[in-house]
From Swiss-Prot:
Heterohexamer of two PFD-alpha type and four PFD-beta type subunits. This is Probable prefoldin subunit 5. GO terms for cellular component: cytoplasm; prefoldin complex. GO terms for molecular function: unfolded protein binding. GO terms for biological process: protein folding; RNA polymerase I assembly; RNA polymerase II core complex assembly; RNA polymerase III assembly. Binds specifically to cytosolic chaperonin (c-CPN) and transfers target proteins to it. Binds to nascent polypeptide chain and promotes folding in an environment in which there are many competing pathways for nonnative proteins. Keywords: Chaperone. It comes from Caenorhabditis elegans. InterPro entries: PFD_alpha_archaea (IPR011599), Prefoldin (IPR009053), Prefoldin_subunit_alpha (IPR004127). SUPFAM superfamilies: Prefoldin (SSF46579). Gene3D superfamilies: 1.10.287.370.
Amino acid sequence: MAEEPKGVPLSELSLQQLGELQKNCEQELNFFQESFNALKGLLTRNEKSISALDDVKIATAGHTALIPLSESLYIRAELSDPSKHLVEIGTGYFVELDREKAKAIFDRKKEHITKQVETVEGILKEKRRTRAYISDAFQTKVQSQLATMNTQ
């Protein structure tokens, strides 16, 4: 059987090694924070899509509306068939669906993104805890070296 890998106690690392470890941990923390923010943005966009489906539900054929092409660019368009919705199912892939199927896709996306948010949230908590341990070890090491220098 393979043995479980053993870590090196933080107290045995030099100041330089602790500094590098702290820097790496900070970079990882920033990466996961950016991922978390991006996922929250996706969740918000998905919620807006679900809300838009509800808004179109009450519309009739010939209804005029502003359609978003991007977050800041809208065009005026006429709704030809309020029962059909164009839904992005992948990068650059769209499919025309009825309201129930479109809502089901958005609900699945919401569920998937929510799970990803929860996963990244857990990783962020762990990374913050690790950063605190490393920071404490670094401070302890600095104080220890200062005390050693003062006694000499």
